[in-house]
Amino acid sequence: MLQPYKHEPFTDFTVEANRKAFEEALGLVEKELGKEYPLIINGERVTTEDKIQSWNPARKDQLVGSVSKANQDLAEKAIQSADEAFQTWRNVNPEERANILVKAAAIIRRRKHEFSAWLVHEAGKPWKEADADTAEAIDFLEYYARQMIELNRGKEILSRPGEQNRYFYTPMGVTVTISPWNFALAIMVGTAVAPIVTGNTVVLKPASTTPVVAAKFVEVLEDAGLPKGVINYVPGSGAEVGDYLVDHPKTSLITFTGSKDVGVRLYERAAVVRPGQNHLKRVIVEMGGKDTVVVDRDADLDLAAESILVSAFGFSGQKCSAGSRAVIHKDVYDEVLEKTVALAKNLTVGDPTNRDNYMGPVIDEKAFEKIMSYIEIGKKEGRLMTGGEGDSSTGFFIQPTIIADLDPEAVIMQEEIFGPVVAFSKANDFDHALEIANNTEYGLTGAVITRNRAHIEQAKREFHVGNLYFNRNCTGAIVGYHPFGGFKMSGTDSKAGGPDYLALHMQAKTVSEMY
């Protein structure tokens, strides 16, 4: 019997033994850099001439790994493999499926620093962020294992005399999982194992910038006893392989995390019924946000500045939950701005293998150029308070940037930047602050810093986001504690790490028997 779920503790790097263990893991992983990784289809290794090369964003000439690249023919084989495996996997006892997740969690826990070190090298994550990513991956495995056992009990419904009624859940079929690079382990793990533990089979297309850590995880599932064909690893082009998988008539479920533009396009494609398709596809998408930290007049201003800083600059702002907007009551605007700027100027930016660096690089050259172009727009729209500089000579580094005095309709107040940039805007009162906070097409996370109980209750009703936090940062959701997913163009409000998430991967069935 499984013990009650509790989240994986974060590593305390003030402890010397933990620091040494992590440094050793970084060294071990560095010796593994540059290796080749095959596709995995029906448990078989498939090597292709065409490769996806994964580069360290902090050392852009350092090859992390070379991964075989799938084409449409191989994507077809992966779909057929998943479809065949589904015929048996769907009937495996849910407790047995859950136990595979628990075993996988134990394997990653034993190799926790190793997986975090891969994230440092491949995704450019600083120690603390990489450690949290790995811990979240473990959490998804442990939490969903327990949730599946609970879900397998079904739901109680009524029966009449002489009639027995049951209501339970059944798997859907082949699932296409398209995972992002920013939580290259955690979100990839969560969106892959949720369909697996519910009895579906998976074709996994990881982000092309972080395919190596995904390959490492598929190996973990194999070691944990997952039968061949239940997960198929097919990195490839979104336009070629991604579209093919989404369009396929045997695809039953699609789970995607990424940009709004790609997510909306995927949603549209999935709605089309293809020749040979006898079902409507279900789509679970999480598409990002333009998230706001609201600071009230009576707030703790030091807490406000710290909350804005952590929300905006953790992992260089490359989180869908990042607080890229700060909306401050006019009476405390100048003081909060001054405090936040002072904190930002003390942040260190550099190679994330160095524990002393708070921020590492952004993910690649394309992201670097996009963020720098937004900063130039911001300089014209508002007042640059700190940062604004970038250096791509050895890696893709951008200084933490604060732009003040922005109109709520300004470009950098409206569009997702996905970088270390936070925009400040002034509110006349609390009603006005909430109005500004809600005036984007997104609705993912938000935070309110206030001591006013009436304003807390008002924000609960009126701040239209899926994850709302009070008197803390708007990032850092923990599986099982803060089910995660947003409104409007942030996605389908499918609450990852929540009690009803697994049911989205299944179909409810009612059985009525007379006796």
Curated annotation (Swiss-Prot):
Assigned EC number: 1.2.1.88
Source organism: Halalkalibacterium halodurans (strain ATCC BAA-125 / DSM 18197 / FERM 7344 / JCM 9153 / C-125) (Bacillus halodurans)
Superkingdom classification of source: Bacteria
InterPro entries registered for this protein in UniProt: Ald_DH/histidinol_DH (IPR016161), Ald_DH_C (IPR016163), Ald_DH_CS_CYS (IPR016160), Ald_DH_CS_GLU (IPR029510), Ald_DH_N (IPR016162), Aldehyde_DH_dom (IPR015590), Proline_metab_enzyme (IPR050485), RocA (IPR005932)
PROSITE patterns cross-referenced by the UniProt entry: ALDEHYDE_DEHYDR_CYS, ALDEHYDE_DEHYDR_GLU
Catalytic residue list: E286, C320
Name by which UniProt lists this protein: 1-pyrroline-5-carboxylate dehydrogenase 1
Enzyme class: oxidoreductase
